[in-house]
Structure formats: C-alpha cells, structure tokens
C-alpha cells in the first residue's frame, strides 16, 4: 500500500472514532483536519477524508480551512476516498451530505476519487452525497445503525484497498 493517511473533521467524537478505526485497520495514522498543512497532503499518496454532517448537509466546520489546504497543496496524482457520518433518522433529507463538499473539493483539486458504496441497506430520504445508486463514499450512522458500522467499514476497505 502506498503512503496513506486518514484525515477527519469531528465535533462530537463519532467521526474521530470511525477515522481511528479505519486508520487502525489500515495500519496508518489518523489526523484531525484542524492539524493539517500542505506537507501533510504532499507527503501522502492516498487520502481518506472523513466528515460529520451538520446543518443542512454541510461538512464539519474545521473542513472549511481543510479544503483550502487540499486545494493549495493540490491533489493531482493522489487517490482520495471519503467517508461521512450522519443521522439518518433525525436528518433523513441531508444524510451524510457533508461528503458531497469533500468530494467536490477533491475533484476540483485534481484527485482521483474512488467510488463509494451502494445505497442499498440504508434508510434515509435524500442526500446530496449520492451519484446514481451509490454514495460518494462510505456513509455511516453511529446514532441509529452503529451495529452496522464495523461491517460497513470492512466491506468498504476491501473495495478500496486494491486502489491504495
């Protein structure tokens, strides 16, 4: 596996916990987006970007500066996958919508973005983070479906590992 890092934005700790789980399974480092700089980006070939979702489907606040860093460092030649944390019961119309902003930023910065997971098996009404019948990354709901998190992470990692 090429140099890989997990970068996350988390306000309540759920997305941080997921990021640390993913990083542990890959044997890589997880870093809070509030602590990244251009060197963090340029020194890794693969970036796994995670955000919790807030408001009307926005990414976690620290990501707004993080996106500026992604763009200034540039992502040409890098592989990106994203994961999002949401609450499909309380916010069924914006489930994991923050992933869309990360996806758009990665594409704009020149990254090769890996496909996401199927929407099958998820309960929600709508999300900006969907393309066809797939999420733009791995969608997780630690509030209502935490019993599915481990299985979803493992399946996603199996899907993306060949590209990392």
Task: Identify the meaning behind each predicted range.
Residues 2-26:
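Short, charged N-terminal beta->alpha structural module
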Residues 14, 25, 29, 43-47, ...:
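FMN-binding flavodoxin-like domain, especially the glycine-rich phosphate-binding loop
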Residues 28-38:
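A short beta-strand-loop structural module common to alpha/beta enzyme folds
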